[in-house]
């Protein structure tokens, strides 16, 4: 049984507290945990208590890492989970961190998918958007629900804008209409547009002269 002889807030990180046992530095834990557990100088702690504290501290650190991971931009649950896994947190800590983010609406795959679709629709087709969301771990049902709201005419118009610009660039180095149309087809395919849209857009764009 060891005795806590000193609690010292870290100079560089006020959220962490150095714990001294029997006059020697032992470890650091979250200031939040110090408060919640009512830890104070002269408390006696055994190895079991130290294990419990270490586990709870790991959960808090994982939660803080999860919050930090979404500070700059939105992420899906899979993206956050993968990042925390790479940092070495165990499954219990990761699950609790994910639950915390969901509870406070910091993590919502449906909201993410909705914003992603709106953001990418001007430069990508629904097929590429679908694949990207699948790679990010969004469920198939959520993806299809969000994609079902896409106006196909609007998607086609966006594809036509891209196609017209592409044709303009291709004509600067290529005069063969057949080769231009083939390159345009592959370009639109790479952007994730479906056959029906590509067929109509290529036909329209090839009749459209767009010179600087």
From Swiss-Prot:
GO biological process assignments: regulation of DNA repair
Key words of the record: Cytoplasm
Localisation: Cytoplasm
Major localization listed first in the record, in broad terms: cytoplasm
Keyword field contains Cytoplasm: yes
One GO CC term, this protein: cytoplasm
Disulphide bonds in the chain: none
Function: Modulates RecA activity.
HAMAP family: RecX
Family, as annotated: Belongs to the RecX family.
Name of protein: Regulatory protein RecX
Organism listed in the record: Clostridium botulinum (strain Alaska E43 / Type E3)
């Amino acid at each position: 049984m060891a005795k806590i002889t000193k609690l010292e807030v870290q100079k560089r990180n006020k959220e962490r507290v150095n714990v001294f046992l029997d006059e020697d530095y032992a470890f650091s834990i979250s200031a939040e945990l110090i408060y919640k557990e009512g830890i104070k100088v002269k408390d006696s702690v055994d190895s079991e208590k130290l294990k419990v504290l270490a586990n709870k501290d790991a959960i808090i650190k994982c939660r803080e890492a999860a919050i930090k991971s979404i500070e700059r931009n939105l992420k899906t649950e899979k993206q956050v989970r993968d990042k925390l896994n790479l940092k070495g947190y165990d499954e219990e800590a990761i699950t609790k961190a994910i639950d915390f983010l969901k509870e406070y609406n910091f993590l919502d795959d449906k909201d993410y998918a909705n914003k992603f679709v709106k953001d990418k629709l001007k430069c990508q087709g629904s097929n590429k958007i679908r694949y990207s969301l699948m790679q990010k771990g969004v469920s198939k049902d959520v993806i299809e629900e969000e994609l079902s709201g896409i106006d196909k005419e609007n998607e086609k118009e966006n594809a036509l804008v891209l196609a017209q610009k592409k044709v303009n660039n291709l004509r600067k180095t290529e005069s063969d209409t057949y080769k231009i149309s083939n390159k345009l087809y592959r370009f639109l395919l790479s952007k994730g547009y479906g056959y029906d849209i590509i067929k109509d857009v290529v036909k329209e764009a090839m009749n459209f002269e767009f010179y600087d």
